[in-house]
């Protein structure tokens, strides 16, 4: 009663606090279920907590072409004529207070790039979006129109001192973004907002880029495989050698497909995968460095009576996280 009605839990902290959001607010909740702060912003998918800041995909709405920036008006998407188009942003909030520190629109950054600007508008798809109506948000079906959803940002990773070395010119704090509509990953300088690196076209409708300790970029590729054993796969790109390695794919004994969502998490060098639309969480048991040889082990399934039950797993934890001290904090009287 004292908090917003949660839709997604983004993160649980060791002191028992929880970061949650719904269609209107993002909020931090105490370990005794009291609201610490709430901020009225539309957020979605996943982001990163870094240096006491939250970096998460934000969303606004605009009418095209009148609300397009000048660079966007000069290229193909300048012909778009649509109201309430989705506008993707990098939303940065103070973790302690919920204050909005900055909100960066991504489209002007892409439109100013000599190569990626030419790729805008080639993707046509059917998707649902949230439409504003008296400050409430409801799902509305759209036809195949790229103008409604030009980028569809679905993840933000922050480059750290541990992985900046895997790129030629990355710096701690830079943004690694996953742009679903463009089938593109892009690295953006966090100060100049210039594009430093990008990777595209080797995956379709991807989510959840993750960098391993060895410089391997893992990507949940939603629709990059064939339909025989499922269209999804886990792609591995060697950032140092600049080439793709064999991927993990479905097979005769393991069907793998999530058309939407999907997430990869890494704990102690082990790969955990949420296949959201299948309602399954599995671990890849890998005995060598070839991802193709990894064996999936189902850890959780929401399926009942052989029927898929789609879930949205926002965060996955090892059981060691929930130590006695943590449980005492959330169970205190």
Predicted feature locations:
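Histidine-/acidic-rich catalytic cores in large beta-rich domains
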Residues: 1-333
């Amino acid at each position: 009663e004292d908090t917003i009605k949660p839709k997604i839990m983004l993160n649980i902290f060791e002191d028992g606090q929880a970061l949650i959001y719904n269609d209107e607010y993002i909020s931090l909740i105490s370990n005794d279920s009291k609201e610490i702060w709430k901020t009225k912003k539309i957020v979605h998918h996943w982001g990163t907590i870094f240096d006491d800041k939250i970096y998460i995909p934000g969303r606004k709405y605009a009418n095209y072409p009148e609300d397009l920036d000048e660079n966007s008006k000069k290229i193909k998407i300048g012909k778009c004529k649509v109201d309430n188009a989705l506008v993707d942003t990098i939303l940065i909030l103070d973790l302690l207070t919920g204050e909005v520190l900055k909100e960066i629109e991504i489209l002007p950054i892409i439109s100013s790039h000599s190569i990626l600007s030419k790729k805008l508008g080639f993707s046509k798809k059917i998707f649902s979006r949230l439409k504003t109506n008296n400050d409430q948000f409801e799902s509305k079906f759209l036809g195949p129109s790229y103008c409604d959803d030009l980028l569809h940002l679905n993840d933000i990773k922050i480059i750290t001192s541990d992985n900046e070395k895997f790129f030629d010119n990355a710096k701690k704090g830079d943004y690694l973004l996953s742009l679903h509509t463009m089938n593109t990953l892009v690295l953006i300088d966090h100060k100049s907002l210039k594009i430093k690196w990008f990777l595209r076209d080797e995956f379709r409708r991807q989510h959840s880029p993750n960098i391993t300790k060895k410089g391997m970029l893992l990507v949940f590729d939603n629709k990059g495989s064939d339909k025989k054993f499922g269209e999804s796969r886990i792609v591995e790109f060697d950032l140092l050698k600049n080439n793709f390695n064999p991927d993990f794919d479905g097979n005769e004994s393991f069907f793998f497909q999530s058309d939407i969502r999907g997430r990869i998490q890494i704990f102690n060098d082990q790969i955990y995968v949420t296949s959201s639309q299948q309602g399954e969480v599995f671990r890849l048991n890998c005995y060598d460095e070839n991802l193709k040889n990894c064996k999936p082990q189902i850890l959780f399934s929401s399926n009942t009576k052989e029927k898929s039950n789609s879930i949205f797993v926002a965060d996955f934890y090892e059981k060691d996280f929930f130590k006695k001290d943590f449980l005492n904090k959330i169970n205190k009287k």
